[in-house]
Amino acid sequence: MPREIITIQAGQCGNNVGSQFWQQLCLEHGISQDGNLEEFATEGGDRKDVFFYQSDDTRYIPRAILLDLEPRVLNGIQSGPYKNIYNPENFFIGQQGIGAGNNWGAGYAAGEVVQEEVFDMIDREADGSDSLEGFMFLHSIAGGTGSGLGSFLLERMNDRFPKKLIQTYSVFPDTQAADVVVNPYNSLLAMRRLTQNADSVVVLDNAALSRIVADRLHVQEPSFQQTNRLVSTVMSASTTTLRYPGYMHNDLVGIIASLIPTPRSHFLLTSYTPFTGDNIDQAKTVRKTTVLDVMRRLLQPKNRMVSINPSKSSCYISILNIIQGEADPTDVHKSLLRIRERRLASFIPWGPASIQVALTKKSPYIQNTHRVSGLMLANHTSVATLFKRIVQQYDRLRKRNAFLEQYKKEAPFQDGLDEFDEARAVVMDLVGEYEAAERENYLDPDAGKDEVGV
C-alpha cells in the first residue's frame, strides 16, 4: 500500500526548486504537461500515487501545496508549461502580495494571519490520502518567507500531525557572499525550527551548488535555474526508492531510520554523480560509470552539496547510497570491500561502520548517457561547522545591534529579543551534539557531565 507524501513549497526558492522537481517526476513517470499518462508509458512497476493522485478524469495531479507571500514566482508557475498539472486550489499568495522583505519576523507573523487558509489546503490533501506517511517541505532559510513562514508552518504541522514525518529540503545561504545582509538572523531563527520540528533535514547550500555547477559546466556565474536543477535531481534521486520500490528503504520511515540513529542529529548531506547532460544541460559526459567508480566519487568532498570544513575527528554517522541503473549486487559487494580496504570513509566509534546501499531501477522513459548513477545521503559530524559559521556571523551582527530595528517592528519580537537568544542556544546545543558524537563514550549516559560549564 503506498504511503503518500504531501509536498509543501514555501517562498521563492521552495517554489522554484519544487517546479523543477515536478517536471522531473513527470518526465520519469511518463506524465504529460497536462497530467495525462503518455501513450508510451506502459511499463508499470512504479508507484506514482506516492506523490500524485488521480483526478476524476484520470489525470495525475501532484500532492503539492504552493505558498508564497509575493506573487511573482507562483504567477510564473501558473503561466508556465506545466501550469495544468497542479490543483489550482492549492496555490496560496499572501493578500498584500508584498512578501516578507527578507525578514524572518514578517514571514512568521504572516503565518498567524494565513494559517487558517493554508491548513485548510493541507488538511484537504491529508484527508484525500489513504495512508499519509508525511510531508516534504521545500524552502530556503535565508529570506523571509521560506525561513519565517516556513518556521511557523513547521511548528504547527508538528502539533497538528504529531505522528507524521516531516522531511525538509533546506537551501542554506552562501555564507561567504552575503546577498542579503540579514541572512544570519533569518538562518539562525529557522535553524531552531529545523532542529526541533523536523524529523530529517537535507542540507543543501548555495555556495556548494554553485561550485559544482561552475566546475562541471565551466561557467563563471551559475544561474539559479542551473542550481535548482541540481536540487531537483537530488530530490528525485532521493525519492526513487519510494517510487520504484524494492524490499528495503521503500518508505520514508525506512530511509530516515537507517540514517538517523539519534533524533537530534538529523541533518543530512548529499553527493550526486555523475553530472552529465541528463541532469544539467551542457555537462560533459564521463566515459564509463561503474558501481565502484560511482561509490568512490560519492565520497569525494568536491561532490558534496554542502560547504563544510571537516576536522581530523569528523566522521560519518551513517551513509545510504542509492544506486540507480544497471548495477549488479556482486559489484556492489566488491565496491564496498574496496572502499573499506582503502579506508575511504571513517565512521563514528560507537556504531556500525557500514555503507548501506539501495539499488533501484531508472525511469524507462528517459534516455540516459550513463549506465549507473548514485546519490549519497549521509549523516556526517562536520555539518556542525556550517551551523557554527551561521552562529559566528549572527554574533558579529548582533554585537553591533545591526538591523535589529526592522525585527523589533514584527510581532515575534514585540516583547524583546529572547527569540534570538533561544535560537542561538538551540543551535549551539546541536553543534555540541555533533561534536559529542565523534567520541566513543557518546552513548554512555554519564558522558559529558564533567564538561558542563566549559
UniProtKB/Swiss-Prot annotation:
Biological process terms in GO annotation = cytoplasmic microtubule organization; meiotic spindle organization; microtubule nucleation; microtubule nucleation by spindle pole body; mitotic cell cycle; mitotic cytokinesis, division site positioning; mitotic sister chromatid segregation; mitotic spindle midzone assembly
Write the record's keywords in alphabetical order, separated by commas: Cytoplasm, Cytoskeleton, GTP-binding, Microtubule, Nucleotide-binding
Q: Which residues form the signal peptide?
A: none
Say which domain of life the source belongs to.
Eukaryota
* SMART domains assigned to the protein according to its UniProt record, in alphabetical order: Tubulin, Tubulin_C
Q: Got a GO cellular component term for this one?
A: gamma-tubulin small complex
Q: Where are the membrane-spanning stretches?
A: none
Q: Which residues bind GTP?
A: 142-148
The entry lists its GO molecular-function terms as: GTP binding; microtubule nucleator activity; structural constituent of cytoskeleton
Cross-referenced InterPro entries, in alphabetical order? Answer: Gamma_tubulin, Tub_FtsZ_C, Tubulin, Tubulin/FtsZ-like_C, Tubulin/FtsZ_2-layer-sand-dom, Tubulin/FtsZ_GTPase_sf, Tubulin_C, Tubulin_CS
> Which PROSITE patterns does the record associate with it?
TUBULIN
Mention any Pfam family matching this sequence. Tubulin
| Location(s) in or outside the cell | Cytoplasm, Cytoskeleton, Microtubule organizing center, Spindle pole body
- Protein function: Tubulin is the major constituent of microtubules. The gamma chain is found at microtubule organizing centers (MTOC) such as the spindle pole or the centrosome, suggesting that it is involved in the minus-end nucleation of microtubule assembly. Interacts physically with beta-tubulin and is involved in microtubule function.
Membership in a protein family = Belongs to the tubulin family.
Q: Give the protein's recorded name.
A: Tubulin gamma chain
Lineage of the source organism?
Eukaryota, Fungi, Dikarya, Ascomycota, Pezizomycotina
